[in-house]
A protein has these predicted regions:
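Glycine-rich phosphate-binding active-site loops on the catalytic face of alpha/beta enzymes
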Residues: 1-9, 53-69, 91-93, 102-124
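Catalytic cores of alpha/beta
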Residues: 38-49, 75-86, 92-108
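Alpha-helix-loop-beta-strand connector modules within alpha/beta enzyme cores
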Residues: 11-30, 34, 67-94
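Conserved anion-binding
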Residues: 1-61
Length: 124
């Protein structure tokens, strides 16, 4: 598992080597990034390094920070091809948010509000 402390301390090479080690394990790898805990430069660098090393599955947010804004989603989609798996987590509370995320090109959402969202679907 890459240590984001290395990234935050600008130990970019170490961060990249840690991703390579995990990638070589031949198990499916999803890189989980909480963009609210990284400045924009490091956030972009983490994505660039991950893409260069062949990471194809990303999760943005961990449910413990602020929700990811639509502006953030747009920026993420510009950096990462829609061919990659992109999951957004945190702050997703209703069906319209889920639909908007899927319409924008997000692959998957994570929410603890599944029951409420499913109830909205049932009432349609």
């Amino acid at each position: 598992m890459p240590n984001f402390i290395n990234l935050s301390k600008r130990n970019i090479d170490t961060f990249g080597m840690e991703i390579e080690i995990v990638k070589r394990s031949a198990i499916p790898v999803t890189l989980i990034i909480n963009n609210s805990k990284l400045d924009k430069e490091l956030f972009v660098k983490a994505i660039e390094i991950s893409l260069e090393l062949g990471i194809k599955s990303f999760q943005f947010g961990d449910g413990f920070g602020p929700p990811i804004s639509t502006l953030d989603v747009d920026e993420i989609l510009k950096m990462i091809s829609k061919k990659n798996h992109i999951k957004i987590v945190g702050g997703i509370k209703n069906l319209s948010q889920v639909i908007d995320l899927f319409d924008s090109g997000i692959s998957c959402v994570g929410t603890s509000n599944f029951s409420e969202i499913f109830e909205e679907v049932r009432n349609i």
